[in-house]
Amino acid sequence: MPRVKRGVTARARHKKVLDQAKGYRGRRKNVYRIAKQAVMKAGQYAYRDRRQRKRQFRALWIARINAAARELGLTYSTFMNGLKKAAVEVDRKVLADLAVFDKPAFAALAEQARAKLAA
């Protein structure tokens, strides 16, 4: 069986990791052993934060809807309950957008919710 020299594959592997570590500070960008750990940790953070981003946006939307609803004399929970009773199927992302950029439309939805809560 012939001898296998793995210099080419090792260089390619090192280059790949060091390219991924471009922009890091200190030895994390140019020392393979340290860069490899930094790239692995970055991947873990990226994986975790792709999931956290969804939670954080939902929390932001809820905070915006709550603030706008309170300006109109409703709490978030009563506002959402009223919308559900009024059969208004608008998601939180759109509601938050309306609360920030189209206050009259949000106020109209709040009135619909208030009417269904009173009935």
From Swiss-Prot:
One Pfam family it belongs to: Ribosomal_L20
Keyword set, alphabetical order: Ribonucleoprotein, Ribosomal protein, RNA-binding, rRNA-binding
* Any one of the GO CC terms: ribonucleoprotein complex
Alphabetically, the GO molecular function entries are: rRNA binding; structural constituent of ribosome
Check the record and name the InterPro entries matching this protein: Ribosomal_bL20 (IPR005813), RIBOSOMAL_L20_CS (IPR049946), Ribosomal_protein_bL20_C (IPR035566)
The reply to whether Ribosomal protein figures as a keyword in the UniProt entry is yes
Q: Name one GO biological process term.
A: ribosomal large subunit assembly
Matches recorded under NCBIfam families: rplT_bact (TIGR01032)
Q: Name the family the entry cites.
A: Belongs to the bacterial ribosomal protein bL20 family.
What this protein is reported to do is described as: Binds directly to 23S ribosomal RNA and is necessary for the in vitro assembly process of the 50S ribosomal subunit. It is not involved in the protein synthesizing functions of that subunit.
State the name under which the record lists this protein.
Answer: Large ribosomal subunit protein bL20
| Taxonomic source organism | Azoarcus sp. (strain BH72)
GN (gene name): rplT
